[in-house]
């Protein structure tokens, strides 16, 4: 009923959050999607415990079954106490580096036709492939946020949509301008990131 109310009110997408004590966002979103026709689901995911190869297939499956009603919001984590509830002892900057590697892997898995091998700092796998591709092209949109230097730099390198808090417009304009400069430094087109 909650998701139906959002759809009837004209929302295009709703956030399904993530905490160390919340219900599984994919299961919640899939249940809600079965009871709506158009509403999209921005599913929050925190890298660290689910392999990017598994999440890539899981998200692509959801994307196909709902004909493109998914986006992912990659969250690097809250405070250390929240992280440790799930057994994650990486420090703040390391968590952001892990998120950057995770997002790159997702995009590689979703856009390459050949098997993918990766030997990175946080993840290692050989010849990963999926027989299930994304419905959306070129891939499922990846949202990302954060205000620290680590977050801004990782987001500039990897995300499709940079999420901001609701703040005064003049502050948001400054943040957007700064973020676009960071995107340009990475060699990406700032207009390609929303």
Task: Please report, for each region that a protein language model flagged, where it lies by residue.
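Hydrophobic faces of well-ordered beta-strands that scaffold small-molecule active sites
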Residues: 14-16, 40-45, 70-74, 142-145, ...
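Flexible, glycine-rich active-site loops centered on histidine and acidic residues
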Residues: 1, 49-117, 165-177
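Glycine-enriched alpha-helix->loop->beta-strand junction motifs that scaffold or abut catalytic
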Residues: 10, 35-39, 66, 156-162
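Short, acidic/polar
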Residues: 1-5, 55-58, 144-154
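Active-site-adjacent beta->alpha loops and helix N-cap segments on the catalytic face
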Residues: 22-29, 168-183
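N-terminal beta1-alpha1-beta2 module of alpha/beta enzyme domains
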Residues: 1-36, 40, 133, 137-140
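Alpha-helix-loop-beta-strand connector modules within alpha/beta enzyme cores
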Residues: 25-46, 98-105, 185-186, 190
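Conserved, mostly hydrophobic/aromatic
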Residues: 6, 10, 32, 62, ...
């Amino acid at each position: 009923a909650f998701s139906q109310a959002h759809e009837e009110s004209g929302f295009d997408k709703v956030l399904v959050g993530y905490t160390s004590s919340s219900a599984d966002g994919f299961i919640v979103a899939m249940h809600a999607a079965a009871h709506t026709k158009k509403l999209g689901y921005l599913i929050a995911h925190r890298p660290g415990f689910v392999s990017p190869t598994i999440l890539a297939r899981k998200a692509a499956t959801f994307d196909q079954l709902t004909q493109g009603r998914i986006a992912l919001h990659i969250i690097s984590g809250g405070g250390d106490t929240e992280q440790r509830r799930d057994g994650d002892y990486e420090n703040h900057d390391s968590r952001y580096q892990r998120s950057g590697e995770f997002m790159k892997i997702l995009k590689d898995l979703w856009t390459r036709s050949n098997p993918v091998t990766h030997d990175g700092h946080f993840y290692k796998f050989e010849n990963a492939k999926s027989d299930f591709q994304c419905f959306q092209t070129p891939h499922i949109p990846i949202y990302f946020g954060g205000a620290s230097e680590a977050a801004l730099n990782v987001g500039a390198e990897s995300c499709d949509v940079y999420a901001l808090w609701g703040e005064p417009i003049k502050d948001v304009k400054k943040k957007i301008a700064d973020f676009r400069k960071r995107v340009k430094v990475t060699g990406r087109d700032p207009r390609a990131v929303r």
